[in-house]
């Protein structure tokens, strides 16, 4: 569905490549990112991201005078495959991939800007030209910036979601995004009926016998 690869070259070996492919199936570039085992970007390195076109230029294999680089939304190549889907846009490619895993692409199709400041009308042109409905899902610390960007873009079928701010908790951190919220809500241990009773009654703990009774009788606490 998405085009994701792995670098095998030099000091970027093992890095993830997020390929930017446009609505005409043309490869614009690939963004290379270094991640730790926990899935977070490896900021311990001298640098932790790069672009394929920049690496080619450095190696003398890209003539910047002959080719004009213009990035596009990650996932844009899917726009015509799911013609009725609402377009959901986040900042991170990784987040788009995770969010899509929880959604039907016929209803919600996730894309990424590949950078907070990359949200511009030019990037959204292929979607605007198709009159698609677009919902922005900014990171927790980037909400106001994307609200301002949406106002500048001035497209009537563009809105900014409040979901990240609505479901955010302090433990998520200021850099949390929609994927972080989804993973926490979906993967969190389910509350037992005994725990629910304890919470609703404002108790620190519930008597073991009562908890056992709730479990044995399969009681539901409303």
What kind of region is each of these model predictions?
Residues 1-28, 79-84, 197-222:
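TOPRIM metal-binding catalytic domain and adjacent DNA-binding surface shared by DnaG-type primases
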Residues 3-11, 38-41, 166-169:
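Low-complexity, polar-biased intrinsically disordered regions enriched in Pro/Ser/Thr/Gly
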Residues 6, 39, 51-55, 73, ...:
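Generic alpha-helical secondary structure signal
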Residues 11, 17-130:
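Phosphate-handling DNA/RNA-contact segment within nucleic-acid enzymes
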Residues 84-85, 94-222:
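TOPRIM fold recognition
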């Amino acid at each position: 569905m998405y085009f994701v690869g792995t670098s095998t070259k030099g000091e970027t070996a093992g890095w993830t490549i997020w390929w930017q492919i446009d609505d005409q199936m043309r490869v614009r570039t690939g963004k290379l990112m270094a991640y730790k085992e926990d899935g977070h970007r490896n900021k311990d390195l001298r640098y932790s991201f790069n672009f394929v076109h920049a690496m080619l230029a450095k190696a003398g294999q890209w003539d910047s005078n002959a080719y004009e680089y213009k990035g596009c939304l990650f996932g844009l190549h899917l726009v015509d495959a799911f013609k009725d889907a609402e377009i959901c846009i986040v900042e991170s490619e990784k987040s788009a991939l995770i969010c899509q895993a929880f959604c039907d692409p016929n209803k919600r199709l996730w894309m990424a800007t590949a950078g907070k400041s990359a949200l511009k009308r030019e990037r959204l042109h292929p979607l605007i030209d198709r009159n698609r409905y677009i919902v922005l899902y900014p990171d927790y610390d980037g909400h106001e910036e994307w609200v301002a960007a949406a106002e500048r873009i001035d497209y009537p079928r563009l809105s900014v979601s409040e979901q990240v701010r609505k479901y955010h908790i302090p433990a998520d951190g200021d850099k949390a995004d929609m994927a972080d919220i989804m993973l926490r809500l979906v993967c969190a241990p389910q509350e037992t009926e005994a725990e629910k009773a304890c919470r609703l009654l404002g108790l620190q703990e519930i008597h073991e016998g009562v908890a056992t009774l709730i479990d044995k009788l399969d009681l539901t606490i409303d």
